[in-house]
């Protein structure tokens, strides 16, 4: 997650600080890693991953950091929620943040080293972009009169692409929207689709035009002071044409997968109908051992309940 500045608390959410943190830090050639307690081993792991990630990011963007980046590592998500680096309340779904005011990266360790590695890499993409486009701090951004706003799908999509390249979750999501012809335009890549849709878009750009175009897009944004004009200068097309090219790419990739498949409605029976019941969620299904019953979470009553549905094979 990238935050442009330290916003006020989210409405109705109190940021309660239960303890004081006695911070220590270690340094690498490009980063200051802050930690507390007995977690120096975690800080050293963070330092190694950060420098490895930075080499990859720097190569793709053709940019060397001009300013050191501070990284603050919390021991748990509960303690991460107490951070005063940003004023925004850190909900459970936020795995890390990078703020522009001083270009600081903040994240918790949740016990999963592979996910932790991904979060470090993801957030450092934001930090390097901040340094490249905005000068690394809000003060430098004002001094240089940089007005360009990097779209969320551009920023988060690139962070996902450089930290994961391509993954099964992204493949599943893009396959689904391509098969069902619900591919959004680039301007419609909001919320969760800013991450996975943006990741797919950067995969398309890097695959068709070469990875050197990644950094060129951002240099062009800074030069033109416009996100769309930056894409146009670097790729030779406006966003409408970029959307069309990306849509064709996805259809070419995924449509052959369904050419020889039977339609789902011809080979199965639908047990839930959210349109008929006027609800939003029918999720987390679990089949009974004999296959006669399905338990799932549903909000058909207006609240989340565990519902039991009997399959067509039930006695």
Region annotations inferred by a language model:
Residues 8-151, 168-169, 187, 226-230:
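Juxtacatalytic substrate-recognition/specificity segment
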Residues 33, 57, 150-170, 175-237:
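Active-site-proximal alpha-helical
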Residues 289-290:
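Residue-level detector of Asp-centered blade-edge/turn motifs that repeat once per structural unit
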Residues 277-280, 297-306:
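A flexible loop/linker signature enriched in serine peptidases of the S9 family
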Residues 259-279:
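A short helix->beta-strand "capping" segment at the edge of beta-propeller domains
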Residues 310-315:
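Conserved small/polar residues in nucleotide/adenosyl-binding loops
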């Amino acid at each position: 997650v990238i935050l442009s500045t330290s916003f006020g608390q989210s409405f109705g959410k109190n940021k309660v600080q239960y303890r004081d943190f006695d911070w220590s830090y270690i340094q690498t050639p490009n980063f200051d890693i802050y930690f507390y307690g007995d977690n120096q081993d975690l800080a050293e792991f963070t330092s190694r991953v950060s420098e490895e990630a930075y080499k990859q990011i720097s190569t793709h963007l053709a940019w060397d950091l001009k300013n050191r980046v501070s990284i603050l590592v919390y021991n748990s998500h509960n303690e991460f929620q107490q951070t005063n680096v940003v004023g925004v309340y850190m909900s459970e779904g936020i795995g890390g943040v990078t703020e522009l005011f001083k270009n600081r990266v903040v994240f918790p360790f949740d016990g999963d080293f592979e996910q932790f590695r991904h979060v470090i890499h993801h957030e450092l993409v934001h930090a390097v972009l901040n340094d490249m486009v905005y000068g690394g701090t809000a003060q430098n951004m004002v001094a240089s009169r940089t007005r360009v706003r990097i779209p969320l799908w551009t920023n988060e999509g690139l962070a996902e692409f450089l930290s994961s390249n391509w993954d099964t979750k992204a493949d599943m999501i893009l396959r689904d929207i391509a098969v069902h012809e619900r591919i959004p335009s680039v301007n419609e890549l909001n919320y969760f689709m800013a991450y996975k849709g943006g990741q797919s878009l950067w995969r398309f750009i890097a695959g068709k035009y070469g990875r050197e175009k990644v950094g060129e897009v951002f240099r062009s944004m800074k030069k033109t002071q416009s996100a769309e004009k930056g894409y146009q200068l670097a790729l030779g097309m406006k966003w409408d044409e970029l959307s069309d090219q990306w849509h064709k790419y996805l259809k070419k990739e995924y449509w052959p997968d369904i050419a020889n498949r039977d339609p789902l409605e011809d080979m199965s029976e639908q047990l839930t109908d959210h349109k008929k019941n006027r609800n939003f969620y029918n999720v987390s299904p679990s089949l009974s051992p004999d296959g006669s019953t399905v338990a799932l979470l549903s909000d058909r009553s207006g609240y989340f309940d565990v519902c039991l549905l009997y399959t067509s094979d039930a006695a």
